[in-house]
Structure formats: C-alpha cells, structure tokens
Amino acid sequence: MDDSDTPTYYLQIEPQDGCHPGDSVERSVTCLPSASDENENQLDGDGHEHLTSSDSAMGKPQVSEQDSLNNNESCTLSCEVAAGENLQNTLCEASRDEQAFLGKDKKIPGKRSPRSKKGTAKKIPPGLFSGDIAPLMQEKVLSAVTYAVDDEEAAEVNANEQPEAPKLVLQSLFSLIRGEVEQLDSRALPLCLHQIAESYFQEEDYEKAMKFIQLERLYHEQLLANLSAIQEQWETKWKTVQPHTVTALRNSEKGFNGEDFERLTKICATHQDPLLSKHKIAAVEKSQERKCSTQLLVSEDPKEGGATTKESESKTCLGTESSKESQHTVEPLGSSPCCHQMDVQTDSPSLSVTAGKDHMEELLCSAEATLALHTQSSETAGSPSGPDSSEDACEDDSRLQLAQTEACQDVARIEGIAEDPKVFLSSKSKTEPLISPGCDRIPPALISEGKYSQAQRKELRLPLRDASEALPTDQLENNELNELQQPDLTDSDGKSPQAQADSDGSENVLCGNNQISDLGILLPEVCMAPEEKGDKDDQLNKETEDYLNSLLEGCLKDTEDSLSYEDNQDDDSDLLQDLSPEEASYSLQENLPSDESCLSLDDLAKRIEIAEVVPTEGLVSILKKRNDTVGDHPAQMQHKPSKRRVRFQEIDDSLDQDEVGGGSCILLVLLCIATVFLSVGGTALYCTFGDMESPVCTDFADNMDFYYTKLLQGVAELKHWIYLS
C-alpha cells in the first residue's frame, strides 16, 4: 500500500482553536475509524502527531497513534481505561454507536504537550447520575475543575480561542445539580454551586455569580443550623448519662490526645475554604494519579501484550499495513512524567517470585512481552514510513526471536540455581548493596558452593543501568529476575531509537553498556545459615539465664551476710562509737575474706553498704531499729520514744495562741498612739521653730484650737460629774 494514497475510512477533524496551516502552531489531526473492528482507543503518546510544513504542503495525512488493546475483547477493560482517565467520566454502554461516540475523546494516558491540554469536556446527561453516589459526584466536580484549569492554560497559549469550554463546564455542573436534586442527596451541591459561581465570575457575569454564591451561603447556614441542633441534642443526652459510663467511655478512648485536638482546632479555625485554587490542585493531582493507575492496569497483562505485539509483527513482516504499524508505539511505560518513577515499583511486585516453576513461566512471558515491546518501539522510532519499513521490521523480528531464545536460556539457568539446595541465602540479611552514584557494581548477597562458585557468578553478571533502581537482594529469585528486567527499561528509556534499531537485539536486551565486575565481594560472617543463628541464639539465652540466676543467688547471699553483719554490729556498737567513721569502716572491712581475687562485684557492693551503715553520733540506724523490734533491746526501745515526748512537751510550753493574739492587739494600739503623738509633736516643733505663716502651720493652729477647746470642755464636764458623785 502506497503511503501517498489517502485512506478513505479516516476522517480528519480540524481542531477548534482557530489555528490555520499558516500559523506557527502546527495542526493536529484526529482520525476516527469507521469500521466496527478497528481499534478506537487513540493513544496520546507524545501529544498529537503534528504535520510538518513539508508534509502539509504535500497533503499527506498521518494516522494518529493507536494502542494495542482490542475493543472487542471486553467492555470492562475499556471502562477501566476510561475511568483511569476520569476526565469525561462516561459510563460504558453495550451498543457500538455509544462506543463510537465515546471513542472520540477516549485516550490512553501518556505524555501531554501543552497544546494537548485544552479542555474538550462533553455534556454529561442528567440520566447518567441516577445510580451514582455523592463521592463519585464530587470526583466529577473535580474533573470539571480540571477542565477549568486546562481552559485557563489554553487561554494563555492562544488568545484567539473562543470561550466554549467554560460553557461546557457550566453545562456539566448544571447536569450534576439536576442529578443532586433528583437524588435528594446534597453533599456535592455546595461544591457545584461554588464552581458555577466561580465560572460566572471569571466570565464577568457578576449578577449570576452573586446569586449562586448566595445559594451556597444559604446551604452552609442551614448546615450550621442543623449542626447546632444535633449538638444540643447530644449535650442533653450527655447530661442525662451517668458519670461512671462517661468515665468508662473516656478511658476507652485512646486515639486522640490533647495535642491532636489542639492541632485540629487550629486547622478548623484557620482554614480558607472555599478556595478554588486548592480544588484545582487537588483535581489535577487526582487525575494524574488515575492516569498512573490506568497505566499500571494496562501494563500488568503481559500475555495479551505479547499476543498483540506478535500479531503486529506478523503484519509488519507481510508488509500489508506498514504505514499503520510504523506509527504504533505499544509501550505505555515511562510515557508520563508522574508514572516514570513508578516503573521500578510496579516491576518489583510482579517479579517478587517464590520458588516454583509457575512463577518462572510467568517471568518468561513477561520477559517476552517486554522484549517484544522494546523491539517494536525501536521499529517505530527508527524505521521510516515507506517500503523499507517492512524489511527493517522483519530484521528486527529475527533479532527479537534470537533475544527471546537467549532469555529462555537465562531463565532456565535461574531455575536451576533456585532449585539447587546447595545455594543458600540468609533469611534476614541486614546488608544492603553498597552503591555509589557513579558506580554500576553491586555486591550480591549470594553464597554458593561447588560448581556454582565461579561459573555461575560469571553467568549471573547482568547490567544495571541506574544505581537508584537497584532493588534489595533479599532472595535469589528477586535479585536475578530484577536484573533480567532492568536492562529492558534502561534500553527503552536511555538509548536513542536509531541506536536500538542498528545494534544487535540480544545485546540490547541482555547485555547493556555497563557491566558488573567480578562478584567477589561477599560477607560470609553476616550471611550465615539460619540453623547456625538459631544455635547461637539458644546458647545466648542459656548464658543469660545462668547469669541472672547467679545474680539472684548472689543478692540473697548478700542480704543474709548483711543481716549477720548487723547482728555483729549491734554487739560491738559501744566499741564502734568510740572510733571514727573511717576506722570503723576499716575494721569492718577486715572481717571480709582477704583474697581479693575471689571478690566479685557483689562483695564490693557489700563493702560499700557496710561502710554506709556505720552509725555516727546523734543518728539512729534504721536496721538497728528493725532488729530492736524483735526484742533484743527493750529498754532502748522505751527510752527513745520518751526523748521524743520531752521534745514535743518543750514546744507545748510556749505561749498560747489566744495570749499571743491579745498581745499583738495591745501592741498595735500602742503603735497607733505613738504615731499620733509623734506626728503632732513634730508639727508643733516645726511651727514653733520654723515658718509660722505657712499653710500647714495655720491649719495646725486652727485644729489645735478646736481640739484644745473640746478637750477643755470635756475636762470641765468630767470634773462636774465627779463633784456630783
């Protein structure tokens, strides 16, 4: 089939951004198949296929990329892909007309150019939401917000774009609100109202924006009223509950403490919702996560991928549809930036294999699938769209077969090593590969014996492209299988497509640019057998038990010896009182065994105890008191409490509290009288020998005249009463 012929079953759709062939921005062509068996899933691997100026001048239409999924196999797989994108959120119907309608906007996640981020939201019928739930509606609202983000970016790129996408967003939000009203479930209603108000505000239709923001405010006011009613009901219930049940519930609660509640209170009191930018970010992140999960779902089925690649290879070798197959890129891994970091993580669970042949067969299938994908990507990138593409594809197919046979041999070798009981590995090895940023060498945690000592080490030397992709070598199967899979990823990511098409296929897959040196860096001390570890653990446990038993016996002996020494000390108490503390401790230490080599830590501690227990003058020993209770010294027992009684009686002989209070009152009155006399006398002295005409002295003279006349009158009346009596 000649490339110059224009296929009649492809329909070219012009983009709606107002661009023309003469503009600087390249035209993008979206092709829709009309046949029922054609693949409808358009692959957006690196944006739309752009027509260069020369191709557009010659009038050659290029077919956009397609993925390797067959739409006629199952409807659920296409639904999973559509749900992973989650930008249109349409339901999967059984009819072919509905699938053809959905196929216009359905795309496998991949890299997106800034031009391909324009919002192409479709109208969502209200009937589709009759069976959905509120969280799904919230996700759909967030998808509508994603369209708003894409519309803003598109407006920045192209200023001549007509404002059709915001209208589509508003229509989708209106359909959401209709579904909410029908279901009588309004949890997503305030979010819809806020997004509609934001859309009208951006369009400068402030009247409608104010109406919808007022509706949102009414919703939240009613929500607050309902919450306050619920709170009042709970408070009344709380007051009627008995106290013991409340404490039981409080003791059973162990999840949150005071700090957690303070943090939550601070967050609830300082949040700035509703804020559109925050919802935008959340929507974008959510859509990217769904893209990643969809890619993982697509890439987890290696057998179907292998089958489709084999079919495409046969078509390419026959040369019937070389122009179509040259455009195919069936490798979704590493296509989007957010999913590139998850490639190694998705390989590790699929390659975490226990010992068994079934898992080895799965490995073989996945290895074949990745080899096929790698070779096909080299075909698509390196081969031109012409008659030579079929020859190059056939050559690459032969290289692929050689690489697959070599991969089968390596897998068989790994099976032999895994089944050999002589090769053993530490179950809980704490060593990790020592990897430097610029080094591609790994010290394996493998100990082999016999025939696997040197020969198998040389066979197991496999390349590792990036040190950051090195996985833990806890088991032999994981180690070798990961090293088989990692060259495929590194070759598809790191090498140029032309170099992949020209180089040998088997060397590209199993031997990379970097080679690992001799596997001689082993740690036999750490990688020991589990049985030897168990024996050593038992021995350590026995030693610790013996040591603890000896400590307990030593402590009991020490207590007995201390009691015996206390008895001897009571007998010689008179002698010890005449000596100084140093001499007493020295004399007591002489009673201990003289052989220093036989002394243990317990004996030394016993010496310290005896030195501390030595009584001094004026102090009473606690141990002596304990021994006195037995009945050795009853006279001393009666004598000591008597001394204490005498001391308390001395305190009781002091002044009574009432007497002390009366004396304090008399003292206070005397102090007041003395203060009055001192003040009056001081003022009189100042006025007598100082300034007589000062205002203080004049006031003082008037007061003295007044009080003096009063005093004279009182004295006269007193004399009169005395005379009468």
UniProtKB/Swiss-Prot annotation:
The chain crosses the membrane at residues 665-685. Residues 63-72, 343-353, 375-388 have a biased composition (Polar residues). One of its GO terms (molecular function) is connexin binding. Residues 300-314 have a biased composition (Basic and acidic residues). Its main location: membrane. It is a single-pass membrane protein. Residues 109-121 have a biased composition (Basic residues). It is found in: Cell membrane; Golgi apparatus, trans-Golgi network membrane; Cytoplasmic vesicle, Secretory vesicle. One of its GO terms (biological process) is positive regulation of Golgi to plasma membrane protein transport. GO terms for cellular component: intracellular membrane-bounded organelle; membrane; plasma membrane; protein-containing complex; trans-Golgi network; transport vesicle. Residues 686-725 are extracellular. InterPro entries: Consortin, Consortin_C, Consortin_N. Residues 1-664 are cytoplasmic. The keyword Transmembrane applies. Residues 1-72, 103-124, 296-353, 375-397, 485-510 are annotated as: Disordered. It comes from the Eukaryota. Keywords: Cell membrane, Cytoplasmic vesicle, Golgi apparatus, Membrane, Transmembrane, Transmembrane helix. Interacts with connexins GJA1/CX43, GJB1/CX32, GJB2/CX26, GJB3/CX31, GJB6/CX30 and GJC1/CX45. Also interacts with GGA1 and GGA2. Does not interact with PANX1. Belongs to the CNST family. Required for targeting of connexins to the plasma membrane. This is Consortin. It comes from Homo sapiens (Human).
